[in-house]
Amino acid sequence: SADYDGILLSTTGDKSDAIITRDLSKTLTVMPGDCLVIALIDEKAGIKGILHAGWKGLIDGVIVNTINMFKEKGANVNNIRGLLFPSVSMNCYDLGEDVISRFRDFAKELGLNEKEVISYNKEKEKYNIDLRKLALTQIKKLGIKDENMSVMEYCTYSSKDEKGNLKFHSHRRDRTLSMNMALFLGKE
């Protein structure tokens, strides 16, 4: 981890996928493609953070590292609340055989039956992964209560508004980095 003027960066390898601060007045920002973004806060301890959990970061421990940093800074898992922002849903998240074994191992580590979080799409010849369920299971195993977590169920790839227009930019669908979402975690 690294500390920059009260903003802590949670690192996984050589990348930083989470920002934590003890200054609740600071606004934190992340720009995901289709990956999970999770906002966490312990108001009693005065700590908040936002993390980006793509498939690599999720497996490599970004959630564990971030919650451990919260605890190191005085947070209590019983007081941590969180929100999962819109992300690509299981049915739209295609992965190849090259990474699926890592997910099988990860699901097993979390005590999940792989059929709960991994499916095979014969038509596309790809695997589908439920990143949300994997993340929520890991968060629960780290001691954060289910009732303290909220999930925005929208799929960044396929969710449409009432007029039938796509709601979100999707890196996977649009194959471009432009028009990316920006998510902000600020003060009320």
For each feature predicted by the language model, list its residue ranges.
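Active-site microenvironment for binding and transforming phosphate-containing groups
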Residues: 1-188
